[in-house]
A protein has these predicted regions:
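Short, well-structured N-terminal submotif of metal-dependent ribonuclease cores
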Residues: 1-39, 53-69, 140
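Residues at the C-termini of beta-strands that transition into short coil/loop
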Residues: 41-42, 85, 123, 138
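Active-site neighborhoods of divalent-metal-dependent phosphate/nucleic-acid chemistry enzymes
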Residues: 3, 49-52, 74-120
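Acidic, PIN/NYN-like endoribonuclease modules and their adjacent C-terminal/linker elements
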Residues: 1-3, 109-140
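A generic structural signal for short hydrophobic patches within well-formed alpha-helices
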Residues: 11, 44-47, 89, 127
Length: 140
């Protein structure tokens, strides 16, 4: 059964309350078993960074965001947060020759490749020269 690695933008979209989340993304996610959804420690890093920034600039909103993040990390994705391994590093290095890929994207792509997963993201262009299956639920 196919498994899916969520890019940070998918998690951020699903966090939106009420009808603010894109209906295509919600429908795509609801059509599959949540146990098939994974995130990378890189996504965890990006989310934690956002929470820390919000806590600094708006403590009340930061507290709400922190509670959401802890629940996401400790319950929603418990057992489905993928680490960076030596294999991930080797794959990521190969993704950066001859074309360099900036920041977190190549780490997330390498994690998807290592674990034979489809990468679910809105940022298709960021992964255009990487041999990984991309799914854009905004376009589904």
């Amino acid at each position: 059964m196919k498994k899916y690695l969520f890019d940070t933008n998918v998690i951020s979209e699903l966090r939106k309350r009420g009808d603010r989340a894109d209906p295509n993304v919600v429908a795509w996610c609801n059509a599959r078993d949540y146990d098939l959804y994974y995130i990378s420690v890189v996504t965890l890093f990006e989310l934690e960074l956002g929470v820390l920034q919000k806590e600094r600039t708006d403590p009340a909103q930061g507290e709400l965001l922190r509670k959401w993040f802890v629940n996401l990390r400790d319950k929603v994705f418990k057992g489905r947060i993928l680490p960076i391994t030596s294999t991930t590093a080797t794959i990521n290095a190969s993704l950066n020759v001859p074309d360099r890929h900036q920041g977190a994207d190549s780490w997330i792509a390498a994690t998807a490749i290592e674990n034979k997963m489809a990468l679910v993201t809105r940022n298709v262009k960021d992964f255009q020269n990487i041999q990984v299956e991309i799914i854009n639920p905004w376009d589904c």
